[in-house]
Each structure stands twice: as C-alpha cells, then as structure tokens.
Amino acid sequence: MQIQVGSQNPTKIQAVKEMFPNIDVIGVQAESGVSAQPFSDEETKLGAITRAKYCAMNNPYTIGVGLEGGVMYIDNELYLCNWGALVTPENDIITASGARIKIPNDVEEGLLKNIELGELMDTYAEKKDVSKKEGAIGIFTNQLITRKEMFRHVVTLLKGQWMLLNSNNH
C-alpha cells in the first residue's frame, strides 16, 4: 500500500507522513481543477477531492490524499480555510476541514486584486517561501500553529474516518 499526496509542497507531504508513519508516502504533481486561489469552502473542498482522486487512480493499491488551502467569506469577513480529501482504492471519498482564522484587511485587499495568498504572505511577512514553511496560519498565529500542523490536524480527521470505515463498527 502507498499513499500519494497530490502536491509537491513539503508541508503537506510531511503532515501525511507523520500521520501514516508505516506507509510509503510520496508527493506527486496533481492539478486541483480549481482556481489558483480558491475563494470559497466549496471550491477549496473540490480542489482537495480532485487532487485525491487523481492520486488514487494511478494504482489500485494507492490511497490518494488531497490537501487544499483557500479563503472564504463569513459575514463579510475573509477567513483562511483548508480542506482535505482521502480517496481509497475502493473509491470511497472522505473529506474534512480544519482551522479557520480571519485574514488581515491588507492581505484581503491583495487577494481581491488576484494575487495568490502564498505570494502575498512572502511580502507580508518579509520572508521567502512562507507557503512551504509556516504558511499563512503560522504568520497569523505568531508561529503557534504552522501550516504543517494545520494540515496534520486535517489528515488526522481523514485517518480517523478511514479507520472507522475499515472497522467492523459501522
């Protein structure tokens, strides 16, 4: 059995490796099928599912995992959102969402000008490759939660549902 993560981003791959330490986990290039900067829960979730499906279809013994970050409005305020999907070799689709945090107004302004969050965060934090390290969540929480930890939480939710699906208790 192998798990393919639909991304080459090290934070996403490491989050999956930590939750599945006894399974071979690799990252593969997988298109999300959504915009480069998803702007709703629905679009972000769809991106995760599309990535996971792509990975699962490559091999009958492969679990596909898709992890997607996006933004969404709640009551006219923009929030960071993230979704994960796990697709089994039997084509069962499991989904989960994680942390949400309000995005500062100056970052929101950049997003509304069609600048991707990853690019904005490098400028906002005056750092390079924030999306491959602590992520926006790391910057916005003063490093208390990193992008890897945020995605690890989502992968934990996916793994728990997958374990239940494979148990005799459902």
From Swiss-Prot:
- Its EC number(s): 3.6.1.73
Q: Where does Mg(2+) bind?
A: E31
Which SUPFAM superfamilies has this protein been placed in? ITPase-like
- Which Pfam family would be a valid example here? NTPase_I-T
The molecular function GO annotations come to: ITPase activity; metal ion binding; nucleotide binding; ribonucleoside triphosphate phosphatase activity
InterPro entries, per database record: ITPase-like_fam, Non_canon_purine_NTPase, NTPase/PRRC1, YjjX_NTPase
Enzyme class comes to: hydrolase
Q: What is this protein's function per UniProt?
A: Phosphatase that hydrolyzes non-canonical purine nucleotides such as XTP and ITP to their respective diphosphate derivatives. Probably excludes non-canonical purines from DNA/RNA precursor pool, thus preventing their incorporation into DNA/RNA and avoiding chromosomal lesions.
Query: Tell me, how does this one assemble?
Result: Homodimer.
Its protein name is Probable inosine/xanthosine triphosphatase
- Organism name: Oceanobacillus iheyensis (strain DSM 14371 / CIP 107618 / JCM 11309 / KCTC 3954 / HTE831)
